[in-house]
């Protein structure tokens, strides 16, 4: 079987696709290739200046809109300004950060990677015609959902276990969303995607010596997005 590449993306003309975190890394590449295939891409990101620079390099049609997944008010504002779309790509995320809280008080990784996307998907679901794609990671194997301490308030914070919890939540959310869509007879689908070891800014922003080492090994071992 031939290896699938971006050249195999079918024509996306007439479709609007929202990609979170599309100002850099995997999100930027995803948005670029979808725009190249004819989609109108919405670059949803916190830093709109970076988003504008990324969008300027994209072929075809792209617009930039502010979305801060660590602020549920921002998520609500973004959803309120969004019309009908074909696809939502839940890509944005943070990895192995120091213990911090979102504007709403959630631990940053579960709040940004899962809860922000959970809220966004729920608010947009009746306007999505085709699919929801959520980027997960093999790091879900590190995770355990601790509903009794989801926000790491009663135990010593461990950044990689917190990341694993968030990525496991992504997978479980996708599984349950797909189950409910199928049970309702919907033709829409919910999918999770593991990108493999890709050289992005995510690893170098882990705020640790290990993160800086990962940023270095990216150049040697990781695949290009």
Residue ranges with predicted function:
Residues 2-206:
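Rossmann-fold NAD(P)H-dependent dehydrogenase/reductase core
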Residues 166, 192, 212-225:
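C-terminal helical subdomain
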Residues 209:
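Short acidic-hydrophobic sequence patches enriched in Asp/Glu that either
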